[in-house]
């Protein structure tokens, strides 16, 4: 996963060349991490020196939780790299609609919705205006993070279900 993400994705530009590279990696990561979590619990279940006899359902839950924890830790890593080293591991997303309470004129919690965003203009410290010409609002990572966690979830659920069926029928 790290080789595919960092070497192929970042250095060889697979994230740009293949639009769904990131989605595929995070889905696969969810699946594989659930497999690792499941295998670890299964090894403990089968070990005669350890008095552990977990049900297939509980094994599937542990595998799912293991996978999601690894996914969250990876997103923490991406966020840290972006903040500390000014990288762009949490890929930007172009949005045409945003919803924010920061623009509520009453400074309350009413979400103000802005639709049809076509461009963002940056105003630099010296007053220089720089239109980005991106065709929308530049979201700097939250949409990517949530998509990554969602597809990790899908991969984890799929493997956990397979693992449950495997142990239940063995």
Task: Please provide the spans of the model-predicted regions.
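Transmembrane alpha-helical insertion/packing segments
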Residues: 1-39
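Alpha-helical transmembrane segments of multi-pass membrane proteins
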Residues: 2-6, 63, 67-74, 78
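Interfacial helix-loop-helix junctions of multi-pass membrane proteins
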Residues: 11-22, 71-72, 76-159
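Membrane-interfacial alpha-helical segments at the cytosolic side of multi-pass membrane proteins
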Residues: 28-45, 83-89, 154-167
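A structural motif
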Residues: 36-48, 122-130
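Canonical alpha-helical transmembrane segment with a positive-inside/aromatic-interface signature
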Residues: 43-60
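Hydrophobic alpha-helical transmembrane segments
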Residues: 61-64, 150
